């Protein structure tokens, strides 16, 4: 959520050349409840995430095209992210994602619970609205 806040406020002049799988907290909550109610879930682990990783630049483009004008879609050079990671905790945590792709196998979750993840774009925009709402209450 911190990265979203930085992107939305314009405090992130460039986005990392990295991609991650995202999880919508509403999906996580839903699967937790369904797992408690479904005996087929006993003793199993369920992955709740997007099937494919999404690039941070894609997140930035979604935000930018939906009125979040302070968001930058420029890519940060990897060497810069590595350097900044020596001083910034969030940049440091992003280093492990550079140049790697992680795919989440959600087939068991989808099959067991007849579940489809909330669309990525909706998750991004709803997250932004939630952060905006919170920040307006704090101010």
Which residues make up each language-model segment?
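NAD(P)-dependent short-chain dehydrogenase/reductase
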Residues: 1-19
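Glycine/proline-rich active-site loop of Rossmann-fold NAD(P)-dependent oxidoreductases
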Residues: 1-2, 35-46
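Substrate-positioning beta->alpha
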Residues: 15-34, 44
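Hydrophobic "lid"/C-terminal helical patch
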Residues: 32-36, 63, 124-131
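Terminal hydrophobic/aromatic helix or amphipathic segment near a protein terminus
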Residues: 46, 51-103, 136-137
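Amphipathic terminal alpha-helices
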Residues: 108-110, 118-139
């Amino acid at each position: 959520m911190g990265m979203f806040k930085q992107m939305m406020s314009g405090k992130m002049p460039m986005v990392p050349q990295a991609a991650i799988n995202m999880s919508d907290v509403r999906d996580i909550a839903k699967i937790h409840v369904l797992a408690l109610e479904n005996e087929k879930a006993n003793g199993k682990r369920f992955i709740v995430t997007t099937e494919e990783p999404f690039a941070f630049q894609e997140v930035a483009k979604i935000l930018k095209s939906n009125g979040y004008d302070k968001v930058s879609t420029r890519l940060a050079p990897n060497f810069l992210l590595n350097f900044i990671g020596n001083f910034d905790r969030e940049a440091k945590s992003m280093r492990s994602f550079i140049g790697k792709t992680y795919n989440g196998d959600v087939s068991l979750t989808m099959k067991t619970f007849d579940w489809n993840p909330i669309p990525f774009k909706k998750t991004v925009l709803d997250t932004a609205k939630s952060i905006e709402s919170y920040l307006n209450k704090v101010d």
